[in-house]
Amino acid sequence: MGITDSHGIMDGKRGRKQLRNITRIGRAIHVQEDEAKSREEHTVEEAQAGEQTSNRKRGNHPAEDDGGARESQSYGALLTLLSAEHGKQRKKRLRKAEAEAAEAAEAGEDPEEAITAALENSAQDAEDAEDAFDDSGESDEEQDHFDVHFNRVSAADVAQLDAAFKNGRAQYRVQKEARGEEEILYSKPVASSEGTEGPVRVPARSLRGYAIKQRLRMHNGLTADDPEKPLTPQQKVLLDPMFQYQDILYEYEGYDREREYRELYTLHILNHVYKTRDRILKNNQKLQDNPDQELLDQGFTRPKALVVVPTRATAYDVVDLLLQQSGIEQVDKKSKFKDQFYDPSLPPASKPKSFQHVFKGNTNDFFVLGMKFTRKAIRLYSNFYQSDVIVCSPLGLQLIIENTDKKKRQDDFLSSIEVMVLDQLHSIEFQNIAHVSNIFAHINKIPQQQRDADFSRIRMWYIEDQAKLFRQTMVFTRYISPFANALLNRKCANWAGRVKSHRVVSAEKSVIGQLGLKLRQIFQRFEVLGGSTVDEPDFRFKFFTSVVVPGIEKTTGYDSGILLYIPEYTDFIRVRNYLKDKTRILFGDINEYSDQRQLTSNRALFQLGRIKVLLYTERLHHFRRFELKGVKSVILYKPPSNPEFYQELLRYIGKSAFLGVADLNIATVRCLYSKMDSLALERIVGTKRAAVLTHGQNEVYEFK
């Protein structure tokens, strides 16, 4: 299973047929094994010559070629390797190839492709083992954070911290640092309140200061002979925590900065994958010389990095960077990947620039893509359990880990994820945040089924169900939200600590400061008794029905053209039902589930003044960015999560005034908020003024 789509679900009969095919092929492989035994009398020179010939043959064919020729090459490569191996090694490799092929077929892949891939994996693993041993000259630095993070933490410290998280006694040692217009918060968990004082941040380094694999250094211009590439201010903030395996929640400044942080995390992922694989291969060689050694270097399954993105266009950018930085030219199924993920089309130029960026290219949000890295090739659409990196959307992964058919559910391939990235979380939040929460519910769990793993080499913290303490989670978003904070605070428990950025917004750079429109803007605060986030929607609704609705019914301003903007769909349903059942207000509504007829009809009626109030949801605005006409006043049930939306809503009034439909001296904007809306308020009014609005003595504040 490499990529999931609407055609990727297979029935049980076909799956069983594939397994029978694999079994028959397994028998055929053993026949080939007997033939291979007869070749053991050949000299080592002949075996090496045969291997070189096989390698040259493979190099003469394009990466995407399929068919019998490729399969015969795979068999030939396998037989050549078998001829040079001892009996135990040969049988072990055959068993592994059979297991991989059966697993792939069970997951829904074509039997012939599954067999071919399994044989190629076996041959390639042997080649990689030799190459990894040839790299023994790459001495791991003493401060290699890969080794420090995963191998040098005592079991006692891990157990103590794990217990502290479970019983709620874990605390954080915190250090704050101001960097221009942003504050960086460094924190590290400790098992008790003792020792919460002390330095947290490790001194900054350049990219060269980290133990990056030599082949990555050479390909990306990071060797001592190359001129040092200057880092951007954003990269300087991210470099150290990223390569020191700390969790990150980062709010980047503009959409044009996305490539900066992606270049870093894709290089980090490649370095992690290469180090993991090379260490396993080198240890394989060590165990052949001394089988009694205890070398713990593995997880339950192979996948080590998970990248979650909102659309195929973003996935294409991420995978393209991984391919560029890998230094590997041979990429299997690259043209198929481009056909399915790349789209040069752009949104209409009339839409806002942020909309054009978010919705450019292929906006499909249903995909899961496996990537397997070897020394000489990258295989796209690889079986999940044979992949090193998985790039997916929340929806695509959701339909695998929470499949309605329990027999088809899979989440074991997430058991050993060590680096996780959530890219463009602000866009993902407009899809379905429940899918993101489900990913965290399934990641780093002990597998339900026994996979092809050597338990004598699985790290103890995997077996002890402590993998979450070692997983690095990096979240990148345009705007930090309460949901983003909750992910970091409740779903992440990295022993190495975490880094969080907070962008300070000056009054001049706030939305109100840059609006350029003299308009009466009223912010009304309501109190949440007890301060519970669970009860906040009820207090907001009560304030709206008792204070705002009577004002609409007895307004001294415009009696039509009132746009009621509601961010949450559950709040929208609640308000709509109340206005319908408890009031006589003539209203209409448009939301993300409205059909085109309803959208067109209600917008026209609102423009003509035949309905007084129009209910409008934030998700609909995010996905469509309508140019609503006839807006004379705006009521925000809650501050928008994206400050650009606030500006766009107010411009509706500006356009009405320009057309002579509204008077700016009469039109008003009213925004309801509580102390829990401070993040959204900061971006609208500025950081200092938001503090006044949320903690000041007054409950009503007005700007013009």
Swiss-Prot record:
It holds the Pfam family Utp25_C. InterPro entries: P-loop_NTPase, UTP25, UTP25_C, UTP25_NTPase-like. Keywords: Nucleus, Ribonucleoprotein, Ribosome biogenesis, rRNA processing. Residues 100-113, 125-143 have a biased composition (Acidic residues). GO terms for molecular function: rRNA binding; U3 snoRNA binding. The gene is UTP25. Residues 30-45 have a biased composition (Basic and acidic residues). Component of the ribosomal small subunit (SSU) processome composed of at least 40 protein subunits and snoRNA U3. It is found in: Nucleus, Nucleolus. This is U3 small nucleolar RNA-associated protein 25. It comes from Eremothecium gossypii (strain ATCC 10895 / CBS 109.51 / FGSC 9923 / NRRL Y-1056). Belongs to the UTP25 family. The keyword Mitochondrion does not apply. GO terms for biological process: maturation of SSU-rRNA from tricistronic rRNA transcript (SSU-rRNA, 5.8S rRNA, LSU-rRNA). DEAD-box RNA helicase-like protein required for pre-18S rRNA processing, specifically at sites A0, A1, and A2. Residues 1-143 are annotated as: Disordered. One of its GO terms (cellular component) is small-subunit processome.
